Amino acid sequence: MKKLYKFLLNALPRPLLIRLSYIFKFFAPFLYRGSAVECPVCERSFSKFLSYGSKVTHRENVLCPYDLTLERHRLMWLYLQRETNFFTAQKLKVLHIAPEQCFLPHFKKQKNLDYITADLVSPIADLHFDLHNIPLEDQQYDVVFCNHVMEHVDDPIRCMSELQRVMKNGGWAIMQVPQDVTRDVTYEDASITSPADREKHFWQKDHVRLFGMDYPQWLERAGFTVEVFDMNEKWEPAEVESYRLMKKEILYILKKS
């Protein structure tokens, strides 16, 4: 049963995986009973997490078998809980682009959030639009989330600028991307078009670039002030390991002044 479970989690496309997540939630507590790792989002412990990723980025012990969080989801959740007033502020207007299924039920029930989701096509989103031309007025949102999107779009600077435009002055945003910390400069090559080649060069079949350590400069070009959050400077190594976070992952906090 465990082998079938693991195969499905790695073989199914993530959108379909998310739709079937209720099935995994039924079996996970029984199949992976234990306390070696912990997911702060679903607040459950397991004997281990599951492996996940493409052929290029396959990783062991990273996927929560209950709510399907990965390292980046757990990092963002812990940051919001520990380092911000996201869950306690009196009122925040939030725009969430390409909303992650693991966050949706939690954010939607927060009474302090005026929470709106958006996507190009996703049926679970409240609004549908192209990030290159956001049909919203200026300075509308206190907080914006847009994770693992900029590696897909034609013009990241245009999309970032549009998101910066709809943020209020004093607002902040998180826009995580796959980032190669060994690469100084973002890698783009318009001649790479086949899914197999894109996976090889950009880590996933539908990616069109691989961001390097210059990612903050892209964000600054779009008008953001960029602050760096390094979990290793704030949190204990034991809990970073227990939550199975990616130790080299940097979280960029974007401010609009």
Language model segments and positions:
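S-adenosyl-L-methionine-dependent methyltransferase catalytic module, highlighting the catalytic core
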Residues: 2-6, 24-37, 154-163, 168, ...
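Local beta-strand N-terminus motif with an aromatic residue
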Residues: 91, 141-142
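Short catalytic micro-motifs in class I SAM-dependent methyltransferases
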Residues: 148-152
